[in-house]
Amino acid sequence: MKRSLDYIKNIFVIVCISFFGSLHSETNTIVYVKKSEKTLTVTKAGKTILKIPISLGFEPEGPKKEEGDGKTPEGTYTIDYQIPEWDYYKALHISYPNKTQLEEAKKRNVKAGSGILIHGMKRHWNWFGHLHTYLNWTHGCMAVTNEEMDLLFEMVPVGSKIRIEP
């Protein structure tokens, strides 16, 4: 019985920390992506703290409509978790697709896509530095250098909003 109560208390504490932590970060840190400028800007309390060049999906114009279209989504999402180690160094996961996008894809009998990230470079590609931004090469993600990914990991807490604009 005591174990069950301890378990319930631990779950309650985790839920409270997650809820109140995301409320705090939502109002403080916002990531803005301007696809037309190929830039990612991080603001905290309304002040720009980082602006960096990015690569986008290989067909960047227009909103993402289905899996495999090479488009980077447009809209407002949440950074819902961090990936500390991955094929492309580190990554921040974006809450794409939302309910509306899932419904629209279902109507067209296609998959909306998933796995949209802000990520670094494969370790053996990192020497490219910002040269990677001359091409849009991802499948819909936003790519930055590994050094920039380290900064984003520090600056952008889980629960932060991300606004991706055309």
Features from the language model and the residues they span:
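Bacterial N-terminal signal peptides that target proteins for export
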Residues: K2-F12
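Exported/periplasmic cell-wall-interacting domains
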Residues: I83-P166
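N-terminal post-signal-peptidase region of extra-cytosolic proteins
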Residues: E26-T29, L56-D80, K99-E104, N146-E147
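A short, polar/charged loop/turn motif at coil->beta-strand junctions and beta-hairpin connectors
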Residues: T27, T48, P73, W86-Y88, ...
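Intrinsically disordered, low-complexity
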Residues: S25-E67, P166
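Structural motif
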Residues: E37-T39, T76, G115
